[in-house]
A protein has these predicted regions:
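Short, well-structured segments within or immediately adjacent to enzyme catalytic domains
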Residues: 1-159
Length: 159
């Protein structure tokens, strides 16, 4: 979606990340922004168009990301996943907040909600320390239709 408009892959690396960050892998340049998996084309072929999105100002395009991994702690994640996948990947690198790019083009900082699960990849205390979680419209409910609101193309009635 954005590739043809970028001059280099450096646009996918947060300038604030350094070798001290747990997910930096000894300072190797890896993507630090993840694309909303729902928009990636892996689920829908071809990838959805912006015309298919009901509320572009309430749909995440990309956000700062890392993924938990039992062996290395964190690793670069090219995607952020809806909360119902139980794989929190939004990373609050900036005073606990993550930069979020919305489909309509606006950007803001959001504090990821710490997941109370992570498929066993990382305990909640470590997630909180690393500011790793999901972007939610409200508190976790356990209901995918509610929790996945910002990640979905079609919004539930009563949004």
């Amino acid at each position: 979606m954005l590739g043809p408009y970028l001059k280099s892959d450096a646009a996918w690396i947060c300038p604030s990340v350094n070798a001290d960050w747990p997910g930096s892998h000894a300072g190797l340049p890896e993507p630090t922004y993840g694309l909303n998996f729902t928009l990636s084309g892996y689920l829908l072929h071809p990838a959805p168009t912006t015309a298919q999105v009901e509320a572009s100002s309430e749909t995440i395009l990309a956000a700062e990301s890392e993924q938990p991994n039992m062996n290395v702690g964190l690793f670069a994640s090219p995607f952020i996943f809806p909360p119902s996948v139980h794989q929190p990947a939004v990373c609050g690198r900036h005073f606990g907040q993550a930069n979020v790019l919305w489909l309509d083009g606006h950007i803001n900082a959001r504090r990821p909600a710490t997941a109370f699960w992570s498929k066993g990849f990382m305990d909640v205390a470590t997630q909180e320390r690393l500011h790793l979680g999901d972007i939610l419209k409200g508190p976790y409910t356990g209901n995918a239709q509610t929790d996945d609101y910002y990640y979905e193309l079609v919004k539930p009635a009563g949004g």
